[in-house]
């Protein structure tokens, strides 16, 4: 087994305007970024890898699965060009390292890790791949490619994939270089293509500081909601790259940073050094999360305890939790939980991201406690947006329970308040609901628009409106 299979790595952006005849008049503006691509190409030529693992946010992306690039049936070359960016002449072509890809997919299947070749096959390479390769192949072309996509899973899962990539490189004795392709924030300028958000420059400053210090453990601490507001592109790709160096000291070199068009372009190189037991960042992160979850459980509201117990019982045993005397002694609920009826929603989050949310506008069970049990099970097993919750996920879930008041009809949107009131929109037999005080929903227009979308109501359709209040338990 080759313990030095990973020769190095790079973080790079992927602006097509850096390539060939694309936007020739703008190349001087991003000359630092172009110089960084050229520096990378020379570094790769010096190291002479057999395989380049290239991680791209624009490769096929799935909510709960990492896709590894593979050819269309009958093809043996992967390729991409820049015709859609105005340059029909510049192109790249490369072969996939199929033994590496197959070995990685096999390892992931063996370890029940959601990564492999089950996604859509295509020999066409996205620009997250082709932009870096355009520069690399000008200097060095004696390599094969492993194309890695991102997923909707948490940052820790991305980091873990990087560790598995290193494991396969070492097992095969393959001299490997890793490129994490990704722009930084897309929200740097008010007059930029994506507008401005304060989180944009903040993200770029933070991530560049992390990269300069090779402080890879800090990558896992970025809040998911913050990342979304910053509109970053490459953070998950950077986490995969970071995982490839778990347990190793790393020399880092910042190449450049600029954002003249409202999108951050950061570039850095990394060289692995000796082992360092203090840099097992995934292990440390999971220990920290376990302590946080344990503390959270100690302070959970009884309604949340009931939702958690319902899901854990159902996932482990496939049975509905019974409200017997033993349970009532363990989870002490207010009297009204057994005497009153109300609609409720149970929401699940994992790694800061929604993992399930189902509820009832009006009560369907004998009491609030039974309503929570029923909706908790539905959230974990019947939310069509997600696969059913697995046993190994239970310890990572964060719960909230919303108990709804009776709704009241209102005449217009002026009577709404996104923090205080949830909204119900109706058009004919279509009805949609959105809870109040949701992260990222900061206007009445957005609240109503999302509720319409959930109901399958077109944006221009007239709707009747109802509002309601909730008591949220966490």
Task: Kindly label every feature range from the protein language model.
Residues 1-50, 61-163, 191-305, 392, ...:
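Flexible, D/E/H-enriched segments
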Residues 51-53, 177:
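Structural motif
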Residues 58-60, 184-185:
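Catalytic metal-binding/acid-base residues of hydrolase active sites
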Residues 65-68, 341-355:
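Polyanion/phosphate-binding surface patch
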Residues 149-203, 348-368:
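Active-site beta-strand/loop microenvironment that shapes enzyme catalytic pockets
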Residues 295-343:
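Short, basic/aromatic recognition patches
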Residues 361-388:
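A short mixed-secondary-structure module that forms the rim of ligand-binding clefts
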